[in-house]
């Protein structure tokens, strides 16, 4: 439960022990407490001088939400500014309640304003029933990062440096440290991260790059855009990632690189892939768009190959408020090439050493990602906990005879998606879940080797049986860090009803 504490309640709780139980609940982690930044001044004015030293300790366990200019404008429509502002903030941020000593002061509250005793009863009482679960709600945790993000945006707006600049450099330094690499180069999208990496590796006309047919289009599309030919190798039936033994069969004198995909948040088996690359003198470009923070034998995704490519698409575990991406590397030579290529191949400006492109990351997106990066580990652990809850619930409900759970073969899996196999009944299950207002998605319904645009490659249905089987059987369930256990229980109960009719 997330609650906004009105200043009248806080003044009472800090002036006496009466009603302080809600603060104790917040301290104990039984609910998430918020205070409006405008409330701090009201507390300072409303408390006795000797009580003001109690304000600062509040901020060690309460979070601050800052009203936007629009929030303030809405609240000024009338004579009850403070009460209207509290309701406006609660509705825009999705808080469950405003805690006040005088709920009757709030007009049109629609039951949103509660006393301390009512909050206590609600937390101690039965959990509200669930009747809808979104696959992903990008805005659900916005209030959690609001202050940090708005500070970054304000800094950028005031400096007027919107393309590259210090914000991008700061993000690059933080990402390289996080991914355990020497360098990181911010670019315009995850797709462009793949393309610029191929260009930096000198891959082009007449070259072949081996990758998976079971992935997002950009993986193979970037290879074609670089002028090279994608060569597909089938996947492991458990991890959905490319297998080294299939890669080896595809290597020819024209092969210049391997592009393994760390699909759904789990790293591919990189040790044998890197051994093949060393044996045949091949570049390895990791498509880690879905796997920031994932690990393989204590090494982070993005540090395993020659370059690692990440996406900051808003739906990713670490997403911007628009498009963005980054390339990681520990190679001095590749780093210099990447920096030049992202600005049309120029060094210095207007003097072009090569044909590059406009692959620049803008400072606003860099600031947003930098602000969110400090939350990533906590969000990742929550996703991992959610995956454990799913596994336990599905096993307890005797559903593993009908569906295959996503195993964590290489710790640690970051669960960008929680993907189950539902066999021949996948499409029926998806329809049933949608009818019960449960968001779910098929990633990916048609493997790349049978996509119309790749017809000239000469592949046909049946060439990659594991990829085709995965495309026909897999289904992604809601797994974001915002999802609650009661929502997961609702989802599993509906899956149980689908398979067992109970």
Where are these regions (language model features)?
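Phosphate-binding glycine-rich loop
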Residues: 161-208, 222-225, 232-234, 299
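Acidic, PIN/NYN-like endoribonuclease modules and their adjacent C-terminal/linker elements
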Residues: 87, 91-135
């Amino acid at each position: 439960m997330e609650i906004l504490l009105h200043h009248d309640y806080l003044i009472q709780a800090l002036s006496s022990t009466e009603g302080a139980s809600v603060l104790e609940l917040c301290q104990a982690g039984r609910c998430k407490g918020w205070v409006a930044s405008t409330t701090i001044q009201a507390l300072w004015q409303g408390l006795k001088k000797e009580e003001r030293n109690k304000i600062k300790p509040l901020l060690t366990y309460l979070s601050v939400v800052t009203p936007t200019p629009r929030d303030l404008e809405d609240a000024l429509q009338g004579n009850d500014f403070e009460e209207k502002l509290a309701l406006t903030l609660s509705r825009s941020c999705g808080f469950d309640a405003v805690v006040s000593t005088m709920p009757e002061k709030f007009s049109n509250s629609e039951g949103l304003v509660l006393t301390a005793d009512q909050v206590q009863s609600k937390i101690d009482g039965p959990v509200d029933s669930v009747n809808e679960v979104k696959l992903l709600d990008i805005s659900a945790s916005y209030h959690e990062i609001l202050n940090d993000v708005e500070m970054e945006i304000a800094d950028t707006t005031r400096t007027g440096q919107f393309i590259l600049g210090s914000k991008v450099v700061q993000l690059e330094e933080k990402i390289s440290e996080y991914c355990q690499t020497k360098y990181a180069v911010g670019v315009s999208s995850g797709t462009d991260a793949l393309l610029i990496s191929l260009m930096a590796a000198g891959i082009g006309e007449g070259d072949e790059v081996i990758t998976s047919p079971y992935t997002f289009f950009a993986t193979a599309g970037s290879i074609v855009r670089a002028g090279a030919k994608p060569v597909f190798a089938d996947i492991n039936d458990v991890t959905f990632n490319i297998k080294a033994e299939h890669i080896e069969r595809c290597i020819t004198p024209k092969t210049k690189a391997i592009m393994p995909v760390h699909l759904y948040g789990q790293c591919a088996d990189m040790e044998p892939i890197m051994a093949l690359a060393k044996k045949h003198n091949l570049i390895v470009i990791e498509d880690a768009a879905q796997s920031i923070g994932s690990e393989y034998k204590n090494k982070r995704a993005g540090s395993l190959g020659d370059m690692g490519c990440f996406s900051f698409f808003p739906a990713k575990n670490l997403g911007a408020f628009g498009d963005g991406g980054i390339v990681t590397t520990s190679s001095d030579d590749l780093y210099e090439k990447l920096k030049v290529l992202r600005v049309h191949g120029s060094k210095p400006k207007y003097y072009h050493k090569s044909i590059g492109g406009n692959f620049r990351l803008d400072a606003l997106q860099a600031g947003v990602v930098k602000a969110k990066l400090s939350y990533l580990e906590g969000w990742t652990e929550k996703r991992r906990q959610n995956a454990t809850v799913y596994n336990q619930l599905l096993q307890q409900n005797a559903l593993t005879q009908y569906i295959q759970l996503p195993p964590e073969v290489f710790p640690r899996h970051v669960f960008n998606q929680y993907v189950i196999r539902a066999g021949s009944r996948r499409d029926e299950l998806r329809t049933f879940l949608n009818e019960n207002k449960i968001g779910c998605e098929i990633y990916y319904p048609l493997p790349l080797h049978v996509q119309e645009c790749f017809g000239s490659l000469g592949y046909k249905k049946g060439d990659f049986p594991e990829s085709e089987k995965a495309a026909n059987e897999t289904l992604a369930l809601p797994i974001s860090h915002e999802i609650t256990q009661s929502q997961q229980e609702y989802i599993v109960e509906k899956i149980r009803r689908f398979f067992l009719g109970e």
